[in-house]
Structures are given as structure tokens and as C-alpha cells.
């Protein structure tokens, strides 16, 4: 996948794995990451909660996140969605046809009306996620099910894209069209304005710094300058 992304000279992709210290995602590495692509499967529970929170903070600050296939059950995706992220599924190597439902979206640039993947795992509705900002792709499967397979979100200052294809026993990520979607998605998710760490702060503004003169009235729980409860 990194090789497919690096085929675009505007992208410089490296890899991080579960087995590495801090899963290859220490603070220093995330601070230099514009977009994180996340694929996970049976070891979702092995991902350290502190790393999940670290990634969530970076997304809120403006780092892009692309979640692939079975990553719908990853801790980070469920953390950002706030829903169970459940769905129907079937492993049968059936054909998947992905229809472009938002042809003017940057992620769909150069894709055409639809594209097909000959062998894939079926995902079917209901997909228990929040209503997305945009639905870029809808999948039809040979067995008759349909699925919202390309969804965009914004969490804090970060752009998030969920892309359905990518079962581990099929060569999906070697498909040229899938690779193009991933490169498009990385470019879309990249926040050109840079990180916004101020989104994580909740400043206690004193009366004397109000924009208009005011007189303090009533009781309060907090002392001047106190950070407050979270």
C-alpha cells in the first residue's frame, strides 16, 4: 500500500505496525504525519488505548485519517464515530461494483461512473455509523446486498474517510483503481492549514478580559484561571 501511495510524487508514505513500540505511532511520529491510513482486523483489542487517544487528539488537531475495510471495528474509528459501527458481512469472494455517487468529489476524481472488484468480502447495511458529510461510493455485491462504502466525516479539524474494500485474502490493494482512490483520499484528507492544537484547549476567560465591560454576578464553582472540569 505504501508503494501504491508513493507512486504519487506529492505523497511520502511509510508504514507502522502493531508489533512496533507504541505501534509505530509515538508522539514524535504523529506530529509529522499529515494523513494516517488505518487497516486492522482481528487484533483491534491489542491496540493500546493510549495510542488510540493520541491518534484521536491528532485528528481533532487536523491530521487526516483514512480507515479501511475491517478498520470499521478499530478502536480509533469507533472512538471518533461514537457508534457501534456494526454491519452485515459474508466471506464468499463475490464481485463488488462500486458506484460513484458524488462524481465531483476529489476522492472520485478520474474514477468514472463505477468500477468493479472481482473478489471481495461482502459488507451490507445497516452500517451503524453517523450520517456522513458525503457518501462518495455505494457498493453492490453479487449476492444482492448494498453498502455505503465511501464516507467522509470531519472530527474537530481533521478530515476522516472510510473506504470499504480491502479483505485480507484478496488482492484488492493491487487494483489500479483502488490505488487511485487511496491516493485521491490522502490528498483530500490532508489539511493544508496545518495543525490546530488550540482546538484542545478550553480557556477560562476572566471578567476583565471580556470583549465588552461586564459586572460579575452570581456564584461560581471555579477559581480565577482554573482549567475547569473535563
Where on the chain are the PLM-derived regions?
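Helical hinge/lid and interdomain linker segments adjacent to catalytic or ligand-binding clefts
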Residues: 1-74
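Catalytic beta-strand/loop cores that center a nucleophilic Ser/Cys/Thr
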Residues: 3-14, 32, 87-162
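Extracellular ligand-binding/catalytic regions of CAZymes and related secreted enzymes
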Residues: 7, 145-147, 154-209
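Hydrophobic/aromatic beta-strand patches that form the interior of the parallel beta-sheet core
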Residues: 37, 66, 134-136, 161-163, ...
Amino acid at each position: 500500500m505504501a508503494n501504491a501511495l508513493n507512486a504519487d510524487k506529492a505523497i511520502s508514505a511509510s508504514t507502522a505496525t502493531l508489533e512496533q513500540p507504541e505501534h509505530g505511532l509515538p508522539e514524535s511520529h504523529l506530529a509529522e504525519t499529515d494523513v494516517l491510513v488505518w487497516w486492522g482486523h482481528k487484533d483491534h483489542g491489542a491496540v493500546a488505548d493510549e495510542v488510540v487517544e493520541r491518534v484521536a487528539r491528532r485528528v481533532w488537531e487536523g491530521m487526516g485519517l483514512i480507515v479501511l475495510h475491517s478498520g470499521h471495528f478499530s478502536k480509533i474509528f469507533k472512538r471518533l464515530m461514537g457508534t457501534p459501527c456494526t454491519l452485515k458481512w459474508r466471506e464468499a469472494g463475490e464481485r463488488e461494483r462500486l458506484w460513484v455517487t458524488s462524481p465531483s468529489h476529489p476522492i472520485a476524481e478520474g474514477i468514472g461512473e463505477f468500477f468493479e472488484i472481482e473478489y471481495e468480502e461482502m459488507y451490507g447495511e445497516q452500517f451503524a455509523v453517523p450520517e456522513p458529510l458525503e457518501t462518495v461510493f455505494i457498493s453492490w455485491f453479487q449476492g444482492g446486498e448494498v453498502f455505503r462504502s465511501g464516507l467522509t466525516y470531519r472530527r474537530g479539524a481533521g478530515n476522516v474517510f472510510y473506504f470499504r474494500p480491502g479483505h485480507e485474502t484478496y488482492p484488492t490493494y493491487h487494483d489500479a483503481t483502488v490505488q487511485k482512490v487511496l491516493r485521491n483520499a490522502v490528498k483530500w484528507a490532508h489539511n493544508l492549514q496545518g495543525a490546530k492544537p488550540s482546538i484542545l484547549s478550553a480557556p477560562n476567560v476572566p471578567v476583565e478580559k471580556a470583549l465588552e465591560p461586564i459586572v460579575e454576578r452570581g456564584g461560581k464553582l471555579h477559581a480565577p484561571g482554573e482549567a475547569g472540569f473535563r
